[in-house]
């Protein structure tokens, strides 16, 4: 463990957790042991002295884009998907608080009875008080992914880096599950991610990150303790940033 926060390169980060990551091996909903493991990983990073914010997806409950493909109005489908992210945020909050992690859920869609509305200054103040802020409701607008929400919130919170927890340990030039010869990138620039259509994040999210010089790190959430390792430049990951030497 690093006891001196000044020894860390990244002192404030945003973690993007997909809804699929919360359901483990299930086909729907939540796998609480998996959520507890993710929460333990987050606690390990907090104990390093790092300020942490989180954006959660909702794909384990509802995917708006899939519903739109079968005929549902896209905007309505996306709003339902946003509600799914609130369910996930509240679930994650409860598991984290069982581990004595102070949290606040802030939703882009106001739901005063269950969580706070998203107000940038309030969110920053929570983080200054060492609370983990869980952002729910996506951007609050349809036709936007939770990846875009993660990039926007990371920039608004002045985070040093956005870390996206996935099922693979980085960015590959092809799907490693389908192609055993797929090449993994250690680092790659924003332009190449877009040009090569690598689909680690949607194009809009990558473009906003590039414009604001927000580095993105892709890593696997499956291995216990990986979050803390990756934030210290250890372990397996891919970094997306402007300049690659």
From Swiss-Prot:
CDD domains reported in the protein's UniProt record: AAK_UMPK-PyrH-Ec
Catalytic activity field: UMP + ATP = UDP + ADP
SUBUNIT field: Homohexamer.
One GO cellular component term: cytosol
Protein's job: Catalyzes the reversible phosphorylation of UMP to UDP.
Single annotated GO MF: ATP binding
Source organism: Rickettsia akari (strain Hartford)
Keyword line: ATP-binding, Cytoplasm, Kinase, Nucleotide-binding, Pyrimidine biosynthesis, Transferase
Pathway: Pyrimidine metabolism; CTP biosynthesis via de novo pathway; UDP from UMP (UMPK route): step 1/1
InterPro entries cross-referenced by the UniProt entry: AceGlu_kinase-like_sf, Asp/Glu/Uridylate_kinase, Uridylate_kinase, Uridylate_kinase_bac
EC class of the enzyme, as a word: transferase
Gene Ontology biological process terms, A to Z: 'de novo' CTP biosynthetic process; UDP biosynthetic process
Binding site for UMP: 58, 78, 139-146
Keyword Kinase set for record: yes
Protein name: Uridylate kinase
Domain of life: Bacteria
Gene: pyrH
Protein's cellular compartments: Cytoplasm
Documented EC number(s): 2.7.4.22
Main location per the UniProt record: cytoplasm
Family listed: Belongs to the UMP kinase family.
Record-listed ATP binding positions: 16-19, 59, 63, 166-167, 172, 175
PANTHER family, alphabetized: URIDYLATE KINASE (PTHR42833), URIDYLATE KINASE PUMPKIN, CHLOROPLASTIC (PTHR42833:SF4)
SUPFAM superfamilies, alphabetized: Carbamate kinase-like
Regulation: Inhibited by UTP.
């Amino acid at each position: 463990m690093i006891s001196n926060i000044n020894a860390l390169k990244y002192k404030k980060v945003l973690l993007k957790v997909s809804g699929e990551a919360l359901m483990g091996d299930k086909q729907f909903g939540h796998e609480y042991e998996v959520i507890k493991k993710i929460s333990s990983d987050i606690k390990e990073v907090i104990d390093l002295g790092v300020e942490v914010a989180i954006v959660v997806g909702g794909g384990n409950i509802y995917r708006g884009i899939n519903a739109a493909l079968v005929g549902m109005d896209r905007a309505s489908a996306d709003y339902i998907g946003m509600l799914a992210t609130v369910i996930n945020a509240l679930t994650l909050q409860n598991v984290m608080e069982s581990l004595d992690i102070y949290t606040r859920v802030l939703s882009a869609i106001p739901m005063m009875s269950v969580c706070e509305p998203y107000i940038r200054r309030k969110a920053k103040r929570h983080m200054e008080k060492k609370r983990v802020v869980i952002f729910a409701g996506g951007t609050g607008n349809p036709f936007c992914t939770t990846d875009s929400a993660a990039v926007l919130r990371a920039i608004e919170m002045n985070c040093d880096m956005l870390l996206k927890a996935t099922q693979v340990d980085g960015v590959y030039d092809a799907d490693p599950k389908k192609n055993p010869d797929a090449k993994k990138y250690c680092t790659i620039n924003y332009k190449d991610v877009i040009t090569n259509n690598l689909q680690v994040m949607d194009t809009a999210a990558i473009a906003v990150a590039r414009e604001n010089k927000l580095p993105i790190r892709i890593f696997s959430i499956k291995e216990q303790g990986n979050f803390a390792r990756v934030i210290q430049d250890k372990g397996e990951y891919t970094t997306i940033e402007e300049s690659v030497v």
